[in-house]
């Protein structure tokens, strides 16, 4: 049952070695990432890997599922970690904060499996970026676009994305 629920929610947890690779890659960049956003925190794997990094002043971790939020809050993360119970698409719309690093593994939910309100939010994001609605075939697309709106001018987005991201259809439009 849990696997079916995770699939419907687009939850595919990032392997620890992938997170370690991402962490090492960022370390080679020698940047200071003061404010970090994790827009789909899930089970907290990225938080576990990054919470003690000296170059990070604050991590905001957004999670839609209340049960996971409660579990994360009970873990006792350092005080610079803020866990927010919200839909990231709503969070991105409301926040005025900008982040130097946005990192994570967005949900992979095919448009056919999205709830109607999620479809509407995703399409609104496409419109905001003056992109055709036909681009919105999966929730990860909306997450990437919403993340762009939360990013500082010289910031970095580092997401685990599917191969389809490299298809001309996605890369050619903008």
Predicted regions and their residues:
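Class I S-adenosyl-L-methionine
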Residues: 1-75, 84-87, 92, 106, ...
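Conserved Class I SAM-dependent methyltransferase catalytic core
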Residues: 43-45, 64-68, 132-174
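Short, conserved active-site loop motifs that form the nucleotide-linked donor/cofactor pocket
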Residues: 81
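Acidic, glycine- and histidine-enriched catalytic cores of nucleic acid- and nucleotide-handling enzymes
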Residues: 86, 101-104, 111-113
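A short acidic, Gly/Pro-enriched loop at the edge of an enzyme's catalytic core
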Residues: 93-102
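Mobile active-site "lid"/loop adjacent to the S-adenosyl-L-methionine
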Residues: 108-136
């Amino acid at each position: 049952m849990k696997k079916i629920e995770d699939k419907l929610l687009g939850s595919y947890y990032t392997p620890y070695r992938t997170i370690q690779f991402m962490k090492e890659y960022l370390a080679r960049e020698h940047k200071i990432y003061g404010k970090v956003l994790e827009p789909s925190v899930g089970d907290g794997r990225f938080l576990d890997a990054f919470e003690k990094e000296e170059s990070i002043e604050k991590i905001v971790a957004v999670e839609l599922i209340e049960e996971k939020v409660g579990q994360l809050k009970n873990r006792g993360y350092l005080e610079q970690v803020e866990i927010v119970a919200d839909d990231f698409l709503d969070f991105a719309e409301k926040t005025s904060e900008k982040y130097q690093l946005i990192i994570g593994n967005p949900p992979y939910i095919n448009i056919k499996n999205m709830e109607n309100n999620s479809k509407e939010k995703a399409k609104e994001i496409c419109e905001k970026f003056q992109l055709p609605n036909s681009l919105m075939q999966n929730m990860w697309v909306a997450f990437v676009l919403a993340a762009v709106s939360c990013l500082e001018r010289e910031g970095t987005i580092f997401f685990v994305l599917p191969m389809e991201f490299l298809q001309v259809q996605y890369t050619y439009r903008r």
